[in-house]
Structures are given as structure tokens and as C-alpha cells.
């Protein structure tokens, strides 16, 4: 997605350790017009799939997931990083956050992820694939079918994309970063 690539090159910032910061337009301050275009592109790429629910993980995946759900007129559910006291009948798994370097026990109500669901998982980044693999585990627990996974940005120099594709999951990334060596952003 050319508009997104240009925005990453213009406003993205690189930090040592393979970190790309896009907080000025994606995951802290958001550009709603760009987010709308991102949602339209995800919908275009997955138009051949029979999807009945959009799923993401809190927090940075919520905005693009809501946009996709709004346009497709589908419900959106997000996997929580902390179990609420009021949640019963939950599915859970452990996910490691690359950015925050910590483990989370993520959870989702089995009322909102069922064997009848054909889901599109949306998230901001695909790096090592930890959040996405957590979603795979939750889908397996629930019996839901993952129709595809859409990521705003994929870091191709980390293993997540290959891991998911090797599992036979349809992955669509709108911008692919080939490397961040010497803090120079190289977009495919």
C-alpha cells in the first residue's frame, strides 16, 4: 500500500534492536483518514473470504479492526491482555510482547469466539508472530476458523510472517519492512 509506505518513510522512526516507531500516525496518535484507507485495503485483500467476525488484540489493533468491522458491518472483538473480574467462560493463552519484553496471559470470552466464527485477525505489527500465534491457539481452543490475518506493518527480517505462512495461514501485510539496519528504514 503505497500511501502507507510513504507515511512510514516520512514519519516512522527507527530505534536500535529492530524497533520501528509509528506512534505519530498508527498506534498512539492515529490518522483516521489513513486508518480508513488501511481498512479498505484489508477488505479488498480478503474479499474472497467468508468472514463473519473481526478479531484483534488490545490495544493497537483495535483502531484498524474497528474500521474494518464498521465498513464490513461485522462485529469486532478484541483479545484482552488482562482478565477482567467479570469474565467467565474464557479461553486463554500466554503471549510474549516483543516491544514490551514481557509475557501476557491473554483471554477472550468463549461467548465471542465460537465454532461458528470465521474470523479475520487484524493487528498493527507482525514481528516474531507471538500475538498472532496466540490468536491461532485461541481459535483452536474455540473451534473458530481463521480466514486470514492482516497486518498494517510486517517486519520481514523477523520470523512471524514465515511462521504463520508455513502453518498455511493467509497473511496480508500492507507494508513490509525488509530491514532496519543502522536505523535506516527499508520498505519492500
Curated annotation (Swiss-Prot):
It comes from the Bacteria. Xanthine binds at residues 20, 27, 155. Its EC number is 2.4.2.22. It is an enzyme of class 2 (transferase). Gene3D superfamilies: 3.40.50.2020. 5-phospho-alpha-D-ribose 1-diphosphate binds at residues 127-131. Belongs to the purine/pyrimidine phosphoribosyltransferase family. Xpt subfamily. Homodimer. This is Xanthine phosphoribosyltransferase.
